[in-house]
Design a protein with these regions (language model features):
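Short helix-initiation/N-cap motifs at beta->coil->alpha
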Residues: 66-77, 164-192
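Immediate post-signal peptide segment of exported/extracytoplasmic ligand-binding proteins
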Residues: 26-38, 57-59, 127-133
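Short, well-ordered beta-strand elements
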Residues: 33-44, 62-68, 135-136
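Ligand-binding "clamshell"
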Residues: 97-109, 124, 196, 201, ...
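Beta->alpha turn/N-cap motifs
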Residues: 68-72, 82-83, 87-96, 112-113, ...
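C-terminal segment of classical bacterial N-terminal signal peptides
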Residues: 17-28
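A conserved helix-loop-strand patch within extracytoplasmic ligand-binding domains
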Residues: 109-159
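A bilobed periplasmic-binding-protein/Venus flytrap-type ligand-binding module shared by bacterial periplasmic
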Residues: 116-127, 229-243
Length: 248
């Protein structure tokens, strides 16, 4: 088993929900010359997983072109500008918030898997070992900031205002027994904070790129109840494109 396969399987082992994957339906509609499907994705695991199904899609008349992108903004901008046919890196709450703020006509085409958000540290092995008053880095985009705070609440580390919901921010923290200082950072930069912060809340894909194995190295991690399934996103009206249906 090569390193790439091991890396992918490590993430999938941590995913409580495997909702789709390399098992694709057969289509009568295929072309003699393959039709290109251009998909933007973050490299790990999304890009790796797409590369694994290229042969399956080619057999259905689709040439899958994977464009690897390393941030959470560019994939949606390129999709809206018709430079991509689809993207694969985000969950529905993030897409809904991003599309609303930027006034983009984008929609989910289908759910794929949950990439769990987890707490990681290079200094501590258990969350109980993190000293009171320590700095914890969390994502600064609205949906993933709320997601990180709900992770802490679900583990009994903080308490949020009852009406905070999926838009919770650090201002909604009403109880913080260990007086953690939450520092908001752009998601791709979170692994870099580990030299300074006591711990950082990092998405599974960025954690893997930083050398962590989510199933093994987390201090705390989302469970199977997480509503944040990663999706394939498309422009509105394209969800039934036969190439997209084959992908999802």
């Amino acid at each position: 088993m090569n390193r790439k396969t091991t890396r992918i399987l490590s993430i999938l082992a941590a995913l409580a929900i495997a909702m789709a994957g390399a098992s694709l339906p057969a289509f009568a509609q295929t072309a003699q010359k393959p039709v290109t499907l251009k998909v933007g994705a973050t490299p790990i695991p999304h890009g790796d997983l797409l590369n694994l199904i290229k042969a399956d899609l080619l057999a259905q008349g689709i040439k899958l072109e994977v464009i690897e992108l390393t941030d959470y903004v560019t994939p949606n901008i390129l999709l809206a500008d018709k430079q991509l046919d689809a993207n694969f890196f985000q969950h529905t709450p993030y897409l809904a918030n991003f599309a609303s703020e930027r006034k983009l006509a984008l929609e989910p085409a289908g759910q794929v898997f949950v990439a769990p958000l987890g707490l990681y540290s290079r200094k501590y092995k258990k969350v109980a070992d993190i000293p009171a008053g320590s700095t914890i880095a969390i994502p600064n985009d609205p949906t993933n900031e709320a997601r990180a705070l709900m992770l802490f609440q679900n583990k009994g580390l903080i308490k949020l205002a009852p009406d905070a919901g999926l838009k919770a921010t650090i201002r909604d923290i009403v109880e913080n027994p260990k007086k953690f200082v939450f520092r908001e950072i752009e998601a791709p930069q979170l692994p870099r904070t580990l030299d300074d912060a006591a711990a950082s809340v990092i998405n599974g894909s960025f954690a893997t790129q930083a050398g962590f194995f989510p199933a093994r190295d987390n201090l705390i991690i989302e469970g199977a109840e997480s509503p944040y399934a990663n999706i394939v996103a498309v422009r509105k009206g394209d969800a039934k494109d036969w190439r997209v249906v084959a992908l999802v």
